[in-house]
Amino acid sequence: MKRELLYEMRFKLMLDENMVTMLAKNKIDFPSTGEISNPNIHGKVDGIYYMLLQPNGEANTRSRGLITVDGGGIVFMDAWGFVRYEANGRFVLHESITHKASKQELAWLNCVQGTVDGFIDGTTGELEANVFKVAVKVKDHL
């Protein structure tokens, strides 16, 4: 099944130390900043990332942020999922995501359920991911 790309994300997680070391503490949170891009939406993102280490070595994730869209408008994003350590300080990222937009021109995001697939470099804090459309919430169309 071919998925529709909503946008690409490039973040910098503001890590105080190596992510592998941080996850040994079981729970971490840190600010993040970055950008999203796509022909339909482009902007800067500021948010917070939370991770909770699980006994199986994965970490549950929760992130919330504000996208300041080029040309005006604010979009709140809320994502949750997990990361799994792969190798060489790299973490595979899988999340679900929803949005809430402040302007009518961006209201199409309010109806979209998405999935995030990407990776985090645990040594640099760089996050690269693609956000794909999974479904449209029907109740928002009524």
Where are each of the predicted segments found?
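Beta-strand-enriched cores of mature, soluble protein domains
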Residues: M1-L142
